Amino acid sequence: MARPGDEHRGAECGARGGGWGGRDIEPGRTGELMKIGIIGAGNIGGNLTRRLTALGHEVSVANSRGPETLAALAEETGATPVTVARAARGAEIVVVTIPFKKVPDLPAGLFDEAAEGFAVIDTGNYYPRERDGRIAGVEDEGLTESRWTERHLGHPVIKAFNGTYAQDILDRHRPAGAADRMALPVAGDDAAAKKTVRALIEELGFDTVDAGGLDESWRQQPNTPVYGLREGVDAVTKALTEASPTRPEAFRG
């Protein structure tokens, strides 16, 4: 099983699903249709593309290799493959789901043409020994992972999906009120953006728990009790309170 928030594999790793553009749209959806840009088409990005198009949202998806490499995902889902520089154009929500170390490589002016009041979701995790190498902002300055990402992006971010198994996005969504409905922690400082993101997650079929501001988002980083937890609101709330701010040795660079 891939680790939670495993965003670095290709989109072909996800299961196939429905979409818009001549494809079936899931019945019983709630909320307004939105334009959503997804930067990263790995496990998380690919499966969010599948589910969001199935719900009727207009999705643009980009990766580092170019839109021509996303033809299969586009054909499957009806999403529009674009360059990274165009992914946020007109978007009301932008999902950044790329390897942590690649965040500084995103183009300047990425959000210049995003919709007014847009929200940014950060799904990333810092894996210094496996992939990312040592990053001083996290190791020396003590920034939370998403605070570091926010500084590079130059826009407030909402941390979500970083502890979610990608396949669960496809397989474990449930109607509101279902006894086995999973809850996901959501952290961030921008109250309006957090409200938007929580509503989207709930539409995707998961409850949400407010995990506090971005400086508290260490509570949902890798190797914390909530990371990878497949439980409901009460268990997720408890797990967040049990987290330690000390970064585990295995997750230090």
Model-predicted segments: where are they?
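Rossmann-fold NAD(P)-binding glycine/threonine-rich loop
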Residues: 124-167, 172-175
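Active-site-lining helix/loop region of Rossmann-like oxidoreductase modules
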Residues: 179-253
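General beta-strand structural signal in soluble alpha/beta enzymes
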Residues: 81, 156-162, 209-213
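Intrinsic-disorder-associated, low-complexity terminal segments enriched in Asp/Asn/His/Tyr and depleted
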Residues: 6-8, 24
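Rossmann-like NAD(P)-binding element
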Residues: 78-121, 125-132
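NAD(P)+-binding Rossmann beta1-loop-alpha1 motif at the extreme N-terminus of oxidoreductases
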Residues: 29-76
